[in-house]
Amino acid sequence: MHPSSRANGPAPHKPYNPFYLQLYFWVIIAIILGALLGHCYPAVGQQLKPLGDAFIKLVKMIISPVIFLTIVTGIASVAHVGTVARVFGKAMVYFLFFSTLALLLGLVVAHVVHPGAGMNINPVDLHQGEIANYVEKSHDLTLVGFLMDIIPKTLLSPFVGDNILQVLFVAVLFGIALALAGERGKPVLNLLDALTVPVFKLVQMLMKMAPIGAFGAIAFTIGKYGVDSLVNLGGLVGSFYLTSLLFVLVILGAVSWLCGFSILKLIRYLKAELLLVLGTSSSESALPSLMEKMVQAGCGKSVVGLVVPTGYSFNLDGTNIYMTLAALFIAQATNTELTPAHQLALFLVAMLSSKGAAGVSGAGFITLAATLAVVPEVPIAGMALILGVDRFMSECRSLTNFIGNAVATLVVSRWENALNYEQLKIALDGSEAAYQSLHANDAEPSVSR
């Protein structure tokens, strides 16, 4: 397998500048300063929310073009519809398997740690006003409605909305049509291929504004919710963070090792994106950059285009851990006994509802509301217990989801024999000489079957 030169591919990052010129350093500084400001001057911190919101809106502005161009050019280059179906099928098998593991891990940890034991909360005494909005939104989450929502009203409507799956749907169909057009479709493919250059250049421009967005978002979070809210529910928050860490290092670490790469090196490779996700509490904020870096790490372009956007809806490992752990925490805190049958129902409902909340703001909390509504044994009023700390768990959910999707892309690429190991090693090792060798000709993975 040898990388082929590509003069018009996305411009690579140049991570070998001094550390104080690198993006991740300034994101760290922004997070620290934002946290200090939010803690010392809560009112001022809350006023900075527009900074984080504006940055996320800017990133979402570019997500649709990035997904569309990556998928269409990737599929049209493959020119085999069967290959697209095979990649999608393998991705869904992976997503289902690891989503199941994440849900089971949350259940196991809740039984071992018992984070809600001894709280003796009476659900009647809980204030339910603040969770009413989440409960109302959860009523709209149905599997049929979710599937129907993937189909857009018009060909252009996905590009003016915020439903990633609709963009994915249109891009796959257009890419297949372009592949079937053969030589007559080449001019269109070349045009779309050329458009990737300014689009990914725009992504790099927007990423330079990440410290500003992270500063505003973290200042708002600390200013509004405060670190004190973590004390009372520290058992739940700590259990969730440790469980997520266990999932990433042990489960994802094991599958990474089996596929020939290190999870720790992958995390180091994606450190700037992970810090951005931490600061903004949104894994979507780093989606364009993740797609670019996965291609640079040797993954097939068509695989990246299919797996990453789909994973943002179907491969939510952090959200799955949160669902079962939080549900059992509420049951323990309210002294609600759950039989094995109840827990099995909880598990199955969580598996389905986590897919139906894809792309919804506050998806983790809304999905939990939908799950508890179907499993009435766990009092839905108990959600009021965790509302105050849910924002702090949101960061961990987003980070785990993000790492899970990066690993999924590499695993499916290897499974599909579309992973350039030489290019992956160069990217993850991060040596300057190797980097310069890799990008001497703006290389992009090209794998012969």
UniProtKB/Swiss-Prot annotation:
Domain of life according to the entry: Bacteria
Annotated localization: Cell inner membrane
PROSITE patterns, per database record: NA_DICARBOXYL_SYMP_1, NA_DICARBOXYL_SYMP_2
Cell membrane listed as a keyword: yes
A molecular function GO annotation: fumarate transmembrane transporter activity
GO cellular component: plasma membrane
Keywords noted in UniProt: Cell inner membrane, Cell membrane, Membrane, Symport, Transmembrane, Transmembrane helix, Transport
GO BP of this protein: L-aspartate transmembrane transport
Chain ranges passing through the membrane: 20-42, 62-84, 91-113, 164-181, 202-224, 239-261, 344-366, 370-389
Statement: the UniProt record of this protein carries the keyword Glycoprotein: no
Mode of membrane association: Multi-pass membrane protein
A Pfam family: SDF
Family listed: Belongs to the dicarboxylate/amino acid:cation symporter (DAACS) (TC 2.A.23) family.
Annotated function: Responsible for the transport of dicarboxylates such as succinate, fumarate, and malate from the periplasm across the membrane.
Name used for this protein in its record: C4-dicarboxylate transport protein
Taxonomic source organism: Xylella fastidiosa (strain Temecula1 / ATCC 700964)
